[in-house]
Amino acid sequence: MNRVIEIHAHYDQRQLSQSPNTNFLVHHPYLTLIPKFLLGALIVYAPYSFAEMELAISGHKQGKDRDTFTMISSCPEGTNYIINRKLILSDFSLLNKVSSGGAFRNLAGKISFLGKNSSASIHFKHININGFGAGVFSESSIEFTDLRKLVAFGSESTGGIFTAKEDISFKNNHHIAFRNNITKGNGGVIQLQGDMKGSVSFVDQRGAIIFTNNQAVTSSSMKHSGRGGAISGDFAGSRILFLNNQQITFEGNSAVHGGAIYNKNGLVEFLGNAGPLAFKENTTIANGGAIYTSNFKANQQTSPILFSQNHANKKGGAIYAQYVNLEQNQDTIRFEKNTAKEGGGAITSSQCSITAHNTIIFSDNAAGDLGGGAILLEGKKPSLTLIAHSGNIAFSGNTMLHITKKASLDRHNSILIKEAPYKIQLAANKNHSIHFFDPVMALSASSSPIQINAPEYETPFFSPKGMIVFSGANLLDDAREDVANRTSIFNQPVHLYNGTLSIENGAHLIVQSFKQTGGRISLSPGSSLALYTMNSFFHGNISSKEPLEINGLSFGVDISPSNLQAEIRAGNAPLRLSGSPSIHDPEGLFYENRDTAASPYQMEILLTSDKIVDISKFTTDSLVTNKQSGFQGAWHFSWQPNTINNTKQKILRASWLPTGEYVLESNRVGRAVPNSLWSTFLLLQTASHNLGDHLCNNRSLIPTSYFGVLIGGTGAEMSTHSSEEESFISRLGATGTSIIRLTPSLTLSGGGSHMFGDSFVADLPEHITSEGIVQNVGLTHVWGPLTVNSTLCAALDHNAMVRICSKKDHTYGKWDTFGMRGTLGASYTFLEYDQTMRVFSFANIEATNILQRAFTETGYNPRSFSKTKLLNIAIPIGIGYEFCLGNSSFALLGKGSIGYSRDIKRENPSTLAHLAMNDFAWTTNGCSVPTSAHTLANQLILRYKACSLYITAYTINREGKNLSNSLSCGGYVGF
């Protein structure tokens, strides 16, 4: 027979004071010590062997005496602490004696902390000990499950707040925060120790996981210390896992190795987490500003990953790992402003594999003189795999420190491969790219080829026909003057299988040898492809004797015109050219630029070889005609006459001959701009309806004696549908109205609305956001069955537009729109029943006038739009009803109508647009809006004495298409 010990302890200072000297012993083979502070509220059920021990605890305990503070357990089958409410353990210090386990010390079996309700939480605060595990120490495993909060703050130890010799796991907790903890050893918060591999796991957390400002500092009494500012694992094969969690943040942690996480001989893995993953401002005295591990993986994340401003005094500003693997992540990944004093500004690794399923950017990372502004690959047989699958990869603004005898200076560098690489593979899916705006350096000789878009990557979901780009486009003027900032070097063979290898904007690519079996190689003015020679950066090497083979050559087009030649230099190797030339301008930038495309333009590629330039299988007869938008014309190709008979040097020329015609790109027409006036129209219409709704014909529906105030929220949407286009507009905000009864039959109202909005036209890359303010006033007069009402509204709308384009940059525009709307109407009651219900007919006239200011966009090739206006005069007619059910204190009231509206005068918005770069103008119109509509409105009011709650809904259908809906609700009080 097995029975379970269950200890219910609620920490209460009054209970403790009543029996401070009480002594109690529990004779149980596994329970070695129960703290005395539990005795005031203790229920004990004596167990026998082979059963888990359960202890239900809660309350707040501050301790000075270890005997009354530390809970010790030793049940081999495990000890479960049941947490029913908040448990706080704080202000305990034991620094003059070496002893592990500040709050909990577990000598055998697994120790678990199990939350049993929504308020279950544990707080460890200011617990300082000279030993391991200021919060919990276990000779076996530790588990935290189903807690609302788990907090550790301001504690100190010689190894972790939570320390175990086996596993430490966190499951199904809601909020975890570890801040300002210090370890004079390893693991500022969590430490795995012992002589067997263990794991730290965070699984299925329902809230944020936060490690902030934790430290692991060195200790003179410990041989290896200062590892893992937040988490440390020592034994080979140990695993640190974050699986299926929400937000994860490591910020401001520090250590000697691994500013946030240290697991030198094990695995650090982030798998399938739904929230953002961020490592920010973590630092280390040695390697791994954020992470130091043998194997790092971040896979299947569905939110952004960020490594920002981490720093290492040696290598790996963000990550120091032998193996780095990033793949199947669905959101953006950014490594930005990480630094390493020696090498690897963001990453130092031996084998690095990165696959982009969304954008991956390495920007503004910096390394010391070992190089690798973004990535440093070192060790035996380093390998690099970069794959742009369904997102692009870009390196920009990364630098390394270049030291000479005279000075040291920053030099741009994205990747440096220190030893002879075993494998370098670059592959981009069709319509995707890998951009190196900073050079790549692989100086150690190797016969293993660099493979670009190799056929082995071909799958039904991946076509290796994308672009690998080496570019100097993002360099500032001072940096461009140093040719080293634009020169990538591979002391290995380079093999282009498919897609495009583009060398542009003055970039240079120097390779051991080059072979092309498919795809295109593109060179823009001032760029070059060269085999290294004695005069190249490879000192002591000689030029390759293998032929430089090109079977698909393209002229790359830069945005700015240039007279510089592109070059292909084969050195001592033969240069063999076959196929036919083409133009590489995937985004059509050349044809949009009047400075280049409106006039004749030439580009040249110089081909040189000390052996022979063989063009016997190359033809220049084909023309390339612009079939895109922009300036029209054709490219003609020819050999410069004075080099035709020169076998070692030839110049290939591409000549652009324009026709003078310009074709506007369809998605640049700008239809969303005049269409945005309908957003202001919707703003005015909604504000006018909200005001008129509370000027009911039956005065009893608004319980106002002299003065009333109404406050509520309102929202509206408007859409148009036709065979050609669809547009969508939405507004959301708040409204307030004051109502004054001037006489028993005359009511004055006034107020305002503040509404935000969004609008766009389907299939156009333009999105407009708006913020508008409306001021309005209304007047209603009742003469028996006849009611006359009028409203006047004035609006100011601030608009901002972003155009998401695939070209060099997005464009942005800002402008104001002004609007006025006035209504005048009358209604007549023709049926009334016992002061509870009436039916009336109505007829109104509504006039709206809206003016948009002229504006010019900013960004690449901006558009200018002239001022435009929208004028609309409509006459709605129909019948309506009102009812009132209740008494003088409590009542349910309602109002509704059905009607028909006809626009008797309409001036649709139309604007003149202009492209300054192209000197081209055109007229653009907003989307078509029908001039007749059917309307349906309903309002319900719940009144109690002078207070009311209301909800109002409007629907307008124009010619069979749902055009607009609005909904408002709020409260009213009268005095």
Swiss-Prot record:
Molecular function in Gene Ontology: ubiquitin binding
UniProt membrane topology term: Peripheral membrane protein
GO cellular component, one term: extracellular region
Organism expressing this protein natively: Chlamydia trachomatis serovar D (strain ATCC VR-885 / DSM 19411 / UW-3/Cx)
Swiss-Prot/TrEMBL keywords: Cell outer membrane, Cell wall, Membrane, Secreted, Signal, Transmembrane, Transmembrane beta strand
Family: Belongs to the PMP outer membrane protein family.
A GO biological process held by the record: double-strand break repair via homologous recombination
Cellular localization per UniProt: Secreted, Cell wall; Cell outer membrane
One Pfam family of this chain: ChlamPMP_M
Span of the signal peptide: 1-51
Name of the protein in question: Probable outer membrane protein PmpA
Domain Autotransporter: 699-975
UniProt xrefs under SUPFAM superfamilies: Autotransporter
